[in-house]
Amino acid sequence: MVWVRDLVKVHRTGATATSAIHHVDLEVRRGEFVAVSGPSGAGKSTLLHLLGGLDRPDGGQIWLDGRRVDGLSEARWAMLRRRSIGVVFQFFNLISNMTVADNVELPALLVGVPPRQARARREELLAELGLESKARSTPAELSGGEQQRVALARALVNDPDLLLADEPTGNLDSRNTRDVLRLLSRVHEQGRTILLVTHDARVASAADRVISLFDGAIAGDTEVSLPASRRGSVADVLQLKD
């Protein structure tokens, strides 16, 4: 599903160059749930942005579903994200003058999903995330945690083959974290591929694998040892309390 070789990204500020991603090799199999962990500044968000076409690499190759994509135009990347890749941004990126309902439905409408079908899918996702009463609210009327859940619903509305999520539980309390991870668990069980950035070891333990980044390089790649039956129940894995 995801195949990366010798990936390099350098951030430049004036005459200063900082290696954000340093010759990374990575393979994520179709249907895997992979967590990416590491300290702040390790390159986690940069890696996700590169895999989603939101930033350009300075070297290496990115292949998605057997197709090389690192050289795609912005327009082709945008189409790929609409149809096949869901992205949950760390800072939400919701459209401020649109309601929650419109924010979630928009990606579906852009790829030609009939309005009635887009609305039904939106209602399903908002209900799963405890947001059905917020459908007519604007982002400014929501808490940070509510905005985060809306961003997740928007990323999932087109049932993407690949979900890239940057700290999707970062602003959530235990109850809402559990709701989000239950939804991610269901998405995973449907065969979707998930790559999730997190600082939380409990959240990472819900994944099949945990990749550790340090100074832009992979410092570890570990299979989660919990039995599949326990990984399938996020509430059990994380033992989250209300």
Predicted regions and their residues:
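Conserved beta-strand-loop-alpha-helix hinge in the C-terminal portion
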Residues: A217-D242
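ABC family nucleotide-binding domain
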Residues: M1-A207, L213
